[in-house]
Amino acid sequence: MSSDTKKPLPYQRILLKLSGEALMGEGKYGIHPPTLMGIAEEVIELAQAGVEVALVIGGGNIFRGVAGATEGMDRASADYMGMLATCINSMAMQDALEKKGLHTRVLSAIKMEQIAEPYIRRRAVRHLEKGRVVIFAAGTGNPYFTTDTAASLRAMEINAQVILKATKVDGVYSADPKKDPTARRYRSLTYMDVLKQNLNVMDSTAISLCMDNKLPIIVFDLTQRGNIRRAVLGEGDIGTLVGGSETVWA
């Protein structure tokens, strides 16, 4: 074997789940272009390394369906508005990636042909095989389901090997580390421990889907530049692995 033989990738196909708030930067609303471009550059690094990348982006930086419902809106209508917010974020990410020369496709669970392709599973897989980044918009297309659940569903449909759940902390903790100085980080967690302890990873529907299909989740800190690449390539102790055989402290 030659010395320049490439090391096999731990994950060939991944789904990156971003919250809408991840695009705000230090702002309180909307999209912060430098933050958006920084995330796009990390996605490009993965694609250039040969990783097939799909994304699901929330819409909470623009509108959150649950919040609208608590203010008296019809829940289904509020959720559909949230789905439209995810489409705005998906288009913004597509623009950022394509400005850097990376081919992308936005596939929407709600038909809007002028701005996105309709979601078809086989088409999504084909785009990935051709080296395009696929951005899944509009959640599952159904109210009452979160974008975390959409991420789990789409990851399974495209046969992704892992979900990367981007957050503002470096993994899953026993308590909120900003409020409790005794909080400890987990290196790995079983799905059942996440559900039993009601840990803030994803909603229970999303976790249950991953558990039933043995799909691992890596929860990591998006604010540290380079962590997306490090998590995918297995470089160092990055975040918390959900789906391990046992629960282990970091």
Curated annotation (Swiss-Prot):
GO BP term (any one): UDP biosynthetic process
Keywords: ATP-binding, Cytoplasm, Kinase, Nucleotide-binding, Pyrimidine biosynthesis, Transferase
Notes on activation and inhibition: Inhibited by UTP.
Domain of life: Bacteria
A Pfam match: AA_kinase
Main location: cytoplasm
Catalytic activity, as annotated: UMP + ATP = UDP + ADP
A cellular component annotation (GO) from this entry: cytosol
This enzyme's EC code(s): 2.7.4.22
Keyword flag Secreted: no
EC class (word): transferase
Sites where the protein binds UMP: 59, 79, 140-147
Keyword Cytoplasm appears in the UniProt entry: yes
Pathway(s): Pyrimidine metabolism; CTP biosynthesis via de novo pathway; UDP from UMP (UMPK route): step 1/1
Compartments where found: Cytoplasm
Protein task: Catalyzes the reversible phosphorylation of UMP to UDP.
Assembly behavior: Homohexamer.
Family from the record: Belongs to the UMP kinase family.
Descriptive protein name: Uridylate kinase
Gene responsible for this protein: pyrH
